[in-house]
Amino acid sequence: MTKTNNFLPLMLDLSGRKIVIFGGGSVGERKAKLFSGCADTLVASLEFSQALQELGTSGQVRLVQLDLLTASDSELRGLISGAFLVIPATSNFELNQKITAIARENDILINQVDTLGSVVIPSVIKRGDLVIGISTLGHSPAVSKYTRKQIEGLVTPEYSDMIRLQDELRSYLKQHVAEQRERKEILWKVLESETVWNGFSESYEKAAERAYAIISSYLVNSNR
């Protein structure tokens, strides 16, 4: 197994990057759903799941119908050409290995579904602009799934609203508070305020109103 201490989590801008997924089943479908909104995603297979067909029809992914078992090396290379990442996700081990070998020859990143490749795709939780990736680097999918369930219970949809509010407050404070240390202190007061968090259950505006009240109180006490 690849040394897992060499892996580092990164957030990548995949705009315009070509992602090639081989396999139109459940695994390929899951990978395609992950990449469809942020990359030029191509899925190659003889048959496609219903969800993949819908993604193709809507233009979110490109579908290439091809019998991969009988496809020539040149056909596979043609699909892989220019790719940023290749994902061999067929049900045929030998075919996956063949695709992997071709990608490696061309120094293309690989996410292998049955072992560690050069790229590990984590389980992803999104709450607006908050993105959390979870991975055990292949050692325990069960622990990864359990961790995801725990975090999903903790990170509520209100986190997305708080990110929006904090971004708004940062801009406001830069105009009214010169010291970065003080701005940070105020933002933390808002972040740790139960009244602000509870305000989101009513509306974003209610939470924002309470946050600005905290800021006003701070500025008054600081004689600003």
Swiss-Prot record:
Q: What is this protein called?
A: Precorrin-2 dehydrogenase
Quote the catalytic activity from the record.
precorrin-2 + NAD(+) = sirohydrochlorin + NADH + 2 H(+)
PANTHER family named among the record's database cross-references:
SIROHEME BIOSYNTHESIS PROTEIN MET8 (PTHR35330:SF1)
InterPro entries of this UniProt entry?
A: Met8-like, NAD(P)-bd_dom_sf, SirC_C, Sirohaem_synthase_N
Q: Its pathway?
A: Porphyrin-containing compound metabolism; siroheme biosynthesis; sirohydrochlorin from precorrin-2: step 1/1
Q: Which keywords does this chain's UniProt record carry? A: NAD, Oxidoreductase, Porphyrin biosynthesis
* Species whose genome carries this gene: Methanosarcina barkeri (strain Fusaro / DSM 804)
Q: Which Pfam families match?
A: NAD_binding_7
